[in-house]
C-alpha cells in the first residue's frame, strides 16, 4: 500500500524572488509527489492566511521558515502511515491540525503544499496523470485561456488602475490553436506598443505594463493588436478584465479612486462605466468590478450586466463555499475565481467548484501573481472540466509552464479532448 513514509518541506523562491513553500511526499512504494505554493499580490481580506516570518533581516520579512517548520515538525509526524490516496481524509486531518477558520495557525501555504504533494504522490503511485486522478475518466475539457496581456494595478508599476486586461480565444477549434492565437496577439501587441513609443517591459504575470492615457486606451490598444494579428474581435477573440477594485476603493469615503485617470466614482457610477465599456468593446468577463465588501454594488452590477457578461468573484468569494453560498443566495455575480491558496486544500477547492456548478455559476481556475514552475492548476482545470483558466500571458516560464502542461494533456486525451470555446460561458445568454 502507498503509505506515507516521509513529508519534507523547504523554502524556495517564487517568480518574484520571494520565498515560498515546497513540499515533498514519499511513500513506501517509492511513489513521490512534489508541490510548490503560489502567492498573491492583491489579496482578499477573507483569504486563508499565508504565514510569513516577519524577520526584516531575512528576505525583507517575507521568509516562510515558520510554515516550513510547521510542515516538518507538526504535519509530517501526523501523516506518517496514511494511505496517500485518501485525499479527503488527509485534507480533513490538515484542517483539524490547524483548527482555525482561516488556516492561521499552520498557514495555508504549509497546508496547501502538503495537500497538493499528496495528490501528486497518489497519481504517481497509480501511474495515471494528475488530472485523471483528481477528476476521473470523464476529465476531458481543455479550458479557454484568459490571457493577461496588459498589466496594471498591483501587478505593474504604471498608471493603469485596472489590474488585468485579458484576451480569450473563444473561436479556436482546440486548445492548441487557442494558445497560438493568444501568442500571436501578444506579439502583435508588442509591435503596436513599440510603434506608439510605449514601454514593452512585462509585469508580474507576463503582460505588458505601459503607461497609457486611460484604462479605456488599454482596451482600444488590445483590439488594435487583435486585428493586426489577423483575428476578429468579438467573434474569434473576446476581452476580459480584472478590475481588482478593492485595491483602489477608499473605505473612508466609500468611493473608487481611479488615480491613473484622476477620477473618483461611486458604486453606481462604476456600474455605469462598465456598462458603457461593454457596449463599446467585446468584453465577456469582468472580475471584482467592485470592492469585496460592496455587496450592494455587486448586486447592481449583476442586475445590469449579469445576463451578458461573466461577473467573476475573486476577492468577493475567495474560493470559499460560505462566501460563495452567500453570493448565490443574494444574486451576486455569476462566476467564481478558483485559487487553491485562498482556501488551502484540494478538497475545499473542489467543494467550491462543485457548489458553483450546481448554482449555474462558472468556475475559472486561476494562478497567482507570485507563481512557480508548478503546473497543478492546469490539471485541476481539466480534472473539473471547468472550461476556463486564467494563468497570465504567454510569457515567462512560470506562466507558460501551465500552458505547456495543457498542451501535453490535450495530446494525451487525443480525440477525446474537448474545447468548448464560447459555450464555456453557460452562465450567459449568448
Curated annotation (Swiss-Prot):
Keyword field: Cytoplasm, Glycolysis, Lyase, Magnesium, Metal-binding, Phosphoprotein, Secreted, Sporulation
Catalysis: reaction(s): (2R)-2-phosphoglycerate = phosphoenolpyruvate + H2O
Domain of life: Bacteria
SMART domains recorded: Enolase_C, Enolase_N
Keyword Glycoprotein: no
A GO CC term attached to the entry: extracellular region
Lineage, uppermost ranks: Bacteria, Bacillati, Bacillota, Bacilli, Bacillales
PROSITE patterns: ENOLASE
Subcellular location: Cytoplasm; Secreted; Cell surface
Chain sites annotated for binding (2R)-2-phosphoglycerate: 163, 339, 368-369, 390
GO terms, biological process: glycolytic process; sporulation resulting in formation of a cellular spore
Record protein name field: Enolase
Modification comment: Phosphorylated during sporulation.
Subunit structure of this chain's protein: Homooctamer. Component of the RNA degradosome complex composed of rny, rnjA, rnjB, pnp, pfkA and eno (although rnjA and rnjB's presence is controversial).
Activity-regulation annotation: Covalent binding to the substrate (probably 2-PG) at Lys-339 of a small fraction of enolase causes inactivation of the enzyme, and possibly serves as a signal for the export of the protein. Citrate acts as a non-competitive inhibitor for both forward and reverse reactions, probably by chelating Mg(2+).
Pathway: Carbohydrate degradation; glycolysis; pyruvate from D-glyceraldehyde 3-phosphate: step 4/5
Role: Catalyzes the reversible conversion of 2-phosphoglycerate (2-PG) into phosphoenolpyruvate (PEP). It is essential for the degradation of carbohydrates via glycolysis.
Originating organism: Bacillus subtilis (strain 168)
Spans annotated as Sufficient for secretion: 1-140
Domain description: The N-terminus (residues 1-140) is sufficient to target GFP for secretion in vivo.
Family membership: Belongs to the enolase family.
Residues with PTM Phosphotyrosine: 281
GO molecular function: magnesium ion binding; phosphopyruvate hydratase activity
Main localization of the protein described in the UniProt heading: cytoplasm
Modified residues (Phosphothreonine): 141
EC number: 4.2.1.11
UniProt note: pH dependence: Optimum pH is 8.1-8.2 for the forward reaction (2-PG substrate).
Amino acid at each position: 500500500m502507498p503509505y506515507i513514509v516521509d513529508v519534507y518541506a523547504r523554502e524556495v523562491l517564487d517568480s518574484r524572488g520571494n520565498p515560498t513553500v515546497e513540499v515533498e511526499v514519499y511513500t513506501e512504494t517509492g511513489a513521490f509527489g512534489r508541490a510548490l505554493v503560489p502567492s498573491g499580490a492583491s489579496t482578499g481580506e477573507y483569504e486563508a492566511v499565508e504565514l510569513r516570518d516577519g524577520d526584516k533581516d531575512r528576505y525583507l520579512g517575507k521568509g516562510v521558515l515558520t510554515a516550513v517548520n510547521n510542515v516538518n515538525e507538526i504535519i509530517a509526524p501526523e501523516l506518517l502511515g496514511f494511505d496517500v490516496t485518501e485525499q479527503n481524509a488527509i485534507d480533513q486531518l490538515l484542517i483539524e491540525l490547524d483548527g482555525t477558520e482561516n488556516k492561521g495557525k499552520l498557514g495555508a501555504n504549509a497546508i496547501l503544499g502538503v495537500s497538493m504533494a499528496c495528490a501528486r504522490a497518489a497519481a504517481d503511485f497509480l501511474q495515471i496523470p494528475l488530472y485523471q486522478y483528481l477528476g476521473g475518466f470523464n476529465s476531458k475539457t481543455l479550458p479557454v485561456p484568459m490571457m493577461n496581456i496588459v498589466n496594471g494595478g498591483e501587478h505593474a508599476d504604471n498608471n493603469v488602475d485596472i489590474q488585468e486586461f485579458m484576451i480569450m480565444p473563444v473561436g479556436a477549434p482546440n486548445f492548441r490553436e487557442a494558445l497560438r492565437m493568444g501568442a500571436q496577439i501578444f506579439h502583435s501587441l508588442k509591435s503596436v506598443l513599440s510603434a506608439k513609443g510605449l514601454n514593452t517591459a512585462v509585469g508580474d504575470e507576463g503582460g505588458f505594463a505601459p503607461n497609457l492615457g486611460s484604462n479605456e486606451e488599454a482596451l482600444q490598444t488590445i483590439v488594435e493588436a487583435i486585428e493586426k494579428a489577423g483575428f476578429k474581435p468579438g467573434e474569434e477573440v473576446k476581452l476580459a478584465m480584472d478590475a481588482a477594485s478593492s485595491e483602489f476603493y477608499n473605505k473612508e469615503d466609500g468611493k473608487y479612486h481611479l488615480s491613473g485617470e484622476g477620477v473618483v466614482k461611486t458604486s453606481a457610477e462604476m456600474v455605469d462605466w462598465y456598462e458603457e465599456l461593454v457596449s463599446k468593446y467585446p468584453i465577456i468577463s469582468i472580475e471584482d468590478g467592485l470592492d469585496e465588501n460592496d455587496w450592494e454594488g455587486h448586486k447592481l452590477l449583476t442586475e445590469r450586466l449579469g445576463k451578458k457578461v461573466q461577473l467573476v468573484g475573486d476577492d468577493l468569494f475567495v474560493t470559499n463555499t460560505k462566501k460563495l453560498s452567500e453570493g448565490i443566495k443574494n444574486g451576486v455575480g455569476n462566476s467564481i475565481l478558483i485559487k487553491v491558496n485562498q482556501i488551502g486544500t484540494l478538497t475545499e477547492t473542489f467543494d467550491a467548484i462543485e457548489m458553483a456548478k450546481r448554482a449555474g455559476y462558472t468556475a475559472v481556475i486561476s494562478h497567482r501573481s507570485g507563481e512557480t514552475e508548478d503546473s497543478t492548476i492546469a490539471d485541476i482545470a481539466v480534472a473539473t472540466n471547468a472550461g476556463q483558466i486564467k494563468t497570465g500571458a504567454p510569457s515567462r516560464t512560470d506562466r507558460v509552464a501551465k500552458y505547456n502542461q495543457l498542451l501535453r494533456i490535450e495530446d494525451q486525451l487525443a480525440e477525446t479532448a474537448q474545447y468548448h470555446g464560447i459555450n464555456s460561458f453557460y452562465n450567459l445568454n449568448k
